[in-house]
Each structure stands twice: as C-alpha cells, then as structure tokens.
Design a protein with these regions (language model features):
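Acidic, surface-exposed loops and disordered segments
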Residues: 1-214
C-alpha cells in the first residue's frame, strides 16, 4: 500500500530506555504492537537508511508511485515549490560517478563501491527555489517519498554529499544541465532508491527532546 499524502511521527511507540553518560535515550522497538496493522505507523517505525543495495533495477511503475506520493505532500498555500528529477539511467549514474572518482580517487578503493549514490540503482533529485523558500515543503515531499518506497519494499537514503559535488565541480556541470532545472532553482538533496541488501537495526531516539506542554 502506498502512503500518499502521509507525514507523521510514531512518538508513542518507543520501547525500552537506556542510559548513557547521564542522558536517557529511548530506543525504538522493532515491533509496533501498540498499533498493529496500521500500515502508516509500521512504515515509519520500520524505515531505515539503506546504504547497501541489490544489483536489481527499480521498476519504473514503483518510481512513478513514489514520486506521485511525493507531490501529494502539503506545501504552503499549495505552491508546490519543488522540481523533481528521477534518474534510473545507468549511463547517467555511472558517468557522473566517473567524474566523482576522478576528483576523489580513493572513493573507488572503498569495498563494494559502485556509484556515488551509495550504489543505489535509481536516484531522485529534489530542487528548491534559489531564494531559499520552499525548503521545508521539499522536506515534506521527501518524507512522503521515502515512506512510499518503504511500503513498496524498497530502501532509501537521503543524500547531500553528491549534491555538493555536482554543484561544485565544473566537470559535473554537464550532468547538472541534463536535469533541466529552471534557472531560479537549485538542487537541494537527492534520495537513493533500490532494493535493500542490508537490514540495519533501529538506532536510539532521544525521547527527552519531546515534551507535552500543559
């Protein structure tokens, strides 16, 4: 089931607490017994950042579902201040990766390195207006997409490093141009998408940062 138009927090579903250095941390439970059967909560609580992917392409239909869920995110006054570009073209991904390797030769020496997008076979680029407006809305867009991907059995990882490289390296300019962004838009971040080849454990979440005000 796709989670179109969904943005939420599973604050009530944390598990046991651990203490480290006098600071109480709350660890998310792998189960969601309190909301068993709620597909939205389950997707939120089970989603992890994936950095290892299977050598398997993502079906175009699933990518279309993901971006459709993304553009159904809320935005201020429904301005929809985003530009979204989906790349599942291996020639593009491998080409920009070669430029990256030329500038960062040690990167190719890392075990299992295939491409600069954490080896994801598909990448979704998100751009926002250069004047700085719309970044919050683009964040909501991205959250919808990563949750939709999770519900479709896909893994994701939000990426900032490749964007810094693409916008700062002159040899990468041709790949940036191929995205055909409006002149008043700039890349904000990217999302790697693919079939996960790892199952990371949940990391601690600090419940002390959440307070109900009476």
């Amino acid at each position: 089931m796709c989670l179109c138009g969904t943005f939420g927090l599973g604050l009530a579903l944390w598990g046991s607490c651990t203490s480290s250095g006098g600071k109480t941390e709350t660890v998310m439970s792998d189960s969601v017994d309190a909301e068993q059967g709620n597909v939205v909560v389950e997707a939120i609580m089970s989603r992890r950042s994936i950095r290892k992917y299977k050598d398997q392409p993502v079906e175009r239909e699933k990518l279309e579902t993901i971006v459709n869920c993304g553009i159904n995110a809320p935005s201020g006054m429904n301005r929809q201040p985003w530009q979204v570009r989906v790349v599942d073209n291996a020639d593009y991904i491998n080409g920009i990766t070669e430029v990256f390797k030329k500038a960062n030769p040690k990167a190719a020496e890392e075990p299992g390195f295939k491409n600069m997008f954490r080896n994801a076979p598909a990448v979704i680029f998100i751009a926002s207006p250069k004047d700085g407006s719309g970044q919050l809305d683009c964040g909501l867009l991205g959250e919808n997409m990563v949750l939709a991907a999770q519900s479709l059995g896909l893994g994701t990882c939000c990426l900032g490093g490749p964007i810094a490289f693409m916008t700062g390296n002159q040899e990468a300019a041709s790949y940036l141009e191929r995205l055909q962004l409006p002149e008043d838009y700039a890349l904000l971040y990217a999302i790697g998408v693919g079939y996960p080849d790892e199952s990371p454990a949940a990391k601690p979440r600090d419940a002390e940062k959440v307070k109900f005000v009476e």
